[in-house]
C-alpha cells in the first residue's frame, strides 16, 4: 500500500476547492506532498514564493501536509520524493479530457506512477483559481472562495 501522494498544481491562489481535495486525500494517505508548480508557461498573479507561503498557511492545521515547490517534470519530482501516486481534482467534464491526457503522459514516462482523480464537494465544484483572480482584479470579495487562513494575505 502507498502511504504518500503528491497533489501538484499552480495554486494561483489556493482555493477552497483545492483545500477540499487536500483534506479528503489526507483520509487516504499518511502524507500528502502539495507540490506548487513553477510553470514558466503560465503567467501567474502571485510569485512562486507567495503561492508556497499561502499554501503553507492554508494547510497549517493539517499535520499530514508538506508543501514544496518544483520546476521539473512532475514524474521526475515524484521519483525524487519516492512517490507513486499523483492526486488531481476534477471539477467538470472539461477538466477530464486534459487530466486524462496528463495522466497517460505521466504513465508513459513512468509506468509505476498512477493518478487518482478526486471530485470536489458540490459547494466547491465551481471554484477555480481563475475565477478568484478575475474577482480579485476588480477588488471583489473572494472570502467565500479561499481558505480563511489566507484572506488577509490577498
Curated annotation (Swiss-Prot):
GO cellular component terms attached to this protein's record: cytoplasm
GO biological process: coenzyme A biosynthetic process
Catalytic reaction list: (R)-4'-phosphopantetheine + ATP + H(+) = 3'-dephospho-CoA + diphosphate
Subcellular location: Cytoplasm
GO MF entry, a single one: pantetheine-phosphate adenylyltransferase activity
Residues of the signal peptide: none
Cofactor or coenzyme needed: Mg(2+)
Residues given in the record as ATP binding sites: 10-11, 18, 89-91, 99, 124-130
Protein name: Phosphopantetheine adenylyltransferase
Amino acid at each position: 500500500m502507498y502511504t504518500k501522494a503528491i497533489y501538484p498544481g499552480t495554486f494561483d491562489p489556493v482555493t477552497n476547492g483545492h483545500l477540499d481535495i487536500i483534506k479528503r486525500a489526507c483520509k487516504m494517505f499518511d502524507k500528502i506532498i502539495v507540490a506548487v508548480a513553477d510553470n514558466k508557461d503560465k503567467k501567474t498573479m502571485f510569485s512562486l514564493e507567495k503561492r508556497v507561503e499561502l499554501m503553507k498557511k492554508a494547510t497549517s492545521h493539517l499535520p499530514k501536509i508538506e508543501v514544496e515547490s518544483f520546476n521539473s517534470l512532475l514524474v521526475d519530482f515524484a521519483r525524487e520524493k519516492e512517490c507513486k501516486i499523483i492526486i488531481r481534482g476534477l471539477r467538470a467534464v472539461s477538466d477530464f479530457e486534459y487530466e486524462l491526457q496528463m495522466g497517460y503522459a505521466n504513465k508513459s514516462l513512468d509506468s509505476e506512477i498512477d493518478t487518482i482523480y478526486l471530485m470536489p464537494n458540490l459547494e466547491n465544484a465551481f471554484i477555480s483559481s481563475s475565477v478568484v483572480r478575475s474577482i480579485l482584479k476588480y477588488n471583489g470579495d473572494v472570502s467565500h472562495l479561499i481558505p480563511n487562513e489566507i484572506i488577509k494575505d490577498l
